[in-house]
Amino acid sequence: MSEQFQHVSVLLHESIDGLAIKPDGIYIDGTFGRGGHSRQILSRLGENGRLYSIDRDPQAIAEAKTITDPRFNIIHGPFSGLKGYVEELGLVGQIDGVLLDLGVSSPQLDDADRGFSFMKDGPLDMRMDPTSGMPVSQWLLTADVEDITWVIREFGEDKHAWRIAKGIVAYRDNEENEPLTRTGQLAKLISDVAPKNFKEKKHPATRTFQAFRIYINSELDEIDTALNGALDVFAEGGRLSVISFHSLEDRMVKHFIRKESRGPQVPHGIPLTENQIKALGSAKMKPIGKAIKPTVNEVDVNVRSRSSVLRIAERL
């Protein structure tokens, strides 16, 4: 791996500590990336421990194949398939920990050819797996103003969503313009249509690029499916350790842990028999500590860690 595409794992020790590694345990790293968390898990496992890592990025799979440790296996696919992979392995109810490091990795951002960054010109792609699905440039060929506005507002939480969407469609529909196929084009277009008094510290294109990436990769659906899948495969006492990088992700994780730690909520005044109450079940998880954020030192070393949040929970 070239120096340009090196990846510094965020909240590395805190997230692995949160898994409370058992030497002979079975663990899943749902987001292999460049293997920082996976290698740390392996360093804490005994000779009978096992680690199954997952990633849908072919470049991540290539990196994973350089690991020859017999305790390690890599699965090429989205982490939303976690439950299915565990079922195929016959390990339901035996998983001692699941780690999810959400969002886009530094190597993906730094590689202009992947199209994730507005800071570097490249193909307007943004797919986590470039071998499947639709690149952003293809989606923008036919998406209307309402659809684009909804995506930017829903996944980018940008108050200028309508203005940006109108600018994109106006540019696209002008036959004198070059096709919108490059990240540099999109970043400039957004800067041009942003209000002249735009005062945010971030680049005007930040939220739109985030929104398009989340949408094109169905990231929030992936997270929801993975969290619920993990719940179904844990052994008693199994740990969930999740690192989020923006408010949409963190809210999902926070609400999931809260919901599963409260158990079924029955409205007051509804008469239930003892058997009916038992059938509803009880809380399935408990939160471990409070949300953890990177230290000042970590942010100084790796500025991309500044927005990260780690949440840990345990299966009951």
Curated annotation (Swiss-Prot):
Q: Where are the transmembrane segments?
A: none
Gene Ontology cellular-component annotations: cytoplasm
User: Which Gene Ontology molecular function entries are recorded, alphabetically?
Assistant: rRNA (cytosine-N4-)-methyltransferase activity
Q: Could you tell me what reaction this enzyme catalyses?
A: cytidine(1402) in 16S rRNA + S-adenosyl-L-methionine = N(4)-methylcytidine(1402) in 16S rRNA + S-adenosyl-L-homocysteine + H(+)
Classification via PANTHER family: 12S RRNA N4-METHYLCYTIDINE METHYLTRANSFERASE, S-ADENOSYL-METHYLTRANSFERASE MRAW
Q: What does the UniProt function comment say about this protein?
A: Specifically methylates the N4 position of cytidine in position 1402 (C1402) of 16S rRNA.
Where, in this chain's numbering, is S-adenosyl-L-methionine bound? 35-37, 55, 79, 101, 108
Q: Which gene encodes it?
A: rsmH
**Subcellular location, record wording:** Cytoplasm
Q: Which domain of life is it from?
A: Bacteria
Species for this entry? Aliivibrio salmonicida (strain LFI1238)
Identify the enzyme class: transferase
Q: What is its EC number?
A: 2.1.1.199
**Keywords tagged on the record:** Cytoplasm, Methyltransferase, rRNA processing, S-adenosyl-L-methionine, Transferase
Where is this chain primarily localised? cytoplasm
* Keyword Repeat included in the entry's annotation: no
Give the family, as the similarity comment puts it.
Belongs to the methyltransferase superfamily. RsmH family.
The name this protein goes by in its record: Ribosomal RNA small subunit methyltransferase H
Upper lineage:
Bacteria, Pseudomonadati, Pseudomonadota, Gammaproteobacteria, Vibrionales
The Gene Ontology biological process terms listed for this entry are: rRNA base methylation
